[in-house]
Each structure stands twice: as structure tokens, then as C-alpha cells.
Amino acid sequence: MQRVGNTFSNESRVASRCPSVGLAERNRVATMPVRLLRDSPAAQEDNDHARDGFQMKLDAHGFAPEELVVQVDGQWLMVTGQQQLDVRDPERVSYRMSQKVHRKMLPSNLSPTAMTCCLTPSGQLWVRGQCVALALPEAQTGPSPRLGSLGSKASNLTR
């Protein structure tokens, strides 16, 4: 009888269809500025502009634009809101930190350089971006070579 052992690596791994792309994306973190949006007809038009792209609205009531950090890390969007609250009473002063984090995976065809982020007066954080058109694969003239190889392997298994 032979004993089989398992070994585990402490090395961090990136789950990706293409490992080299995953490693390259891991090191690209961009922080987007959060601007305060005023209620105006132009703001509504700007909101309608995102119909053909990515749009996410988040409740950020109580946070100021400078308390919000919006980052794009590869295909992930991360929104962090952090506040320091002073609690004062006659006997002492104390501080309390409040932090909220939201993570969302972005569409693969989203252009991170074309993203905008704004905070409405009502406390809604809008993150928007334009999606680029994906190139369609060229039409093939005949059976797919992969399907053919799967068929031959399947027939070998039934023998």
C-alpha cells in the first residue's frame, strides 16, 4: 500500500481564466474622485447618459464626499466610507470610527478610465461607466475543431 500525502502552498493565487492577466490586474488599483452632484436638469441628463453602460447606486447617507473612497481593482469595484465620530459628555471625550465597505464585480467590457462617481444631496452614491463593444468572433466555415476532438474522445471512451 502506498501513502499519498497532500502539500499546501502558502503562495497567494489569483483565480483567472488567464493567470498572466489576473496577475497584471491584481496590481492595478485606481482611486476615483467623488464629486458632489447638485440637483439640476443637467444632473438628470447625466443620469440618463448611463443607460448604455454600467450604473450602480449605493446608499451613502451621512457620508461626505471626502469620507468616501471609490477604487477599481482589476474587475472589482470597492467603495469604502469611513467616519470618525466624536462623543463628548461632561466627564470624558471619546472617538468612534465607523466604516462601511461594499464590493461589486464589474462587467468585463467596462472601461475603468471612463468611470465617474458622484454623491447626490440625498446621499445616493452613483458610480457609472461606459461599456465598450465586444468584438464578435469571426464566422467559422465548418465544424469547430474542439467539438470534433471531443467527439473522437467520446467515441474512444465507449469502446
Curated annotation (Swiss-Prot):
PROSITE patterns documented for this protein: SHSP (PS01031)
Cellular component terms per the entry's GO annotation: cytoplasm; cytosol; intracellular membrane-bounded organelle; nucleoplasm; nucleus
Subcellular location: Cytoplasm; Nucleus
Gene3D superfamilies: 2.60.40.790
Tissue specificity annotation: Testis specific.
Protein keywords: Cytoplasm, Nucleus, Stress response
Chief location of this protein within or outside the cell: cytoplasm
ATP-binding keyword on record: no
InterPro entries, sorted: A-crystallin/Hsp20_dom, HSP20-like_chaperone, HSPB9
Domain sHSP residues, every copy: 36-147
Family indicated by similarity: Belongs to the small heat shock protein (HSP20) family.
Protein name, per record: Heat shock protein beta-9
UniProt organism field: Homo sapiens (Human)
Name of the gene this protein is made from: HSPB9
